[in-house]
Amino acid sequence: MQIYGRYFPLIALIFSGLIAQAHQPDLSSLMIYEQGGKSFLAIKSALSAFESEIEYSYHKGAYKTPTEFEELVIEHFQKKSFLVVNGDTIKFLNPQVSLGHETTLFAELSEIPNDIESMQIKNAIFGDISHSICEVIITLNGIPQKQFLLTSENKHEAMLRLENGTWVMIENEHPLFIFTKSALIISSIFIGILLLIAGWAFF
């Protein structure tokens, strides 16, 4: 934790209020923040939550040492999470894990633009845990602070747009739902054409 060690007291202080019940595996927090001219992401939850997800996604006995466990946590994080700003995917640089009863994953964020117009966040690290709730806080210089929840209801994903200095949540429709709506529209048009043809034939 050499890189993020100097920032840990700040993050620990912020998260202490957000996740006082962090020993519950269905609760987690994600923060996007700035420190020392750089942008970072931090995810915090109970160690048991990380353990449950790793054992579910891989298998029991997938790791034998803390280092192997940390590597799997980082791999799982990179598979299950993403951040898109102004349409560009942000890279997670040098992710690290601080193990404890309350375990934290840190990553530096690459090339966050100065003028942020939109943001899409997904954090499904704990998506396999029943009733999983992730509290998200965005606190970056030059933009309003935003706080919201990621749950199974929004598929652990949120889309936001900055309008007149205020964050607006955008409805994120699932591709299957979009396909279903499109299919219904096309079917309705097709049926309408058939009825119209039938009407002409009748007269």
Task: Map each language-model feature to its residues.
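Bacterial N-terminal signal peptides that target proteins for export
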Residues: 1-8
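N-terminal soluble domains immediately following signal/targeting peptides that reside
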Residues: 21-188, 194-201
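Bacterial N-terminal signal peptides
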Residues: 9-17
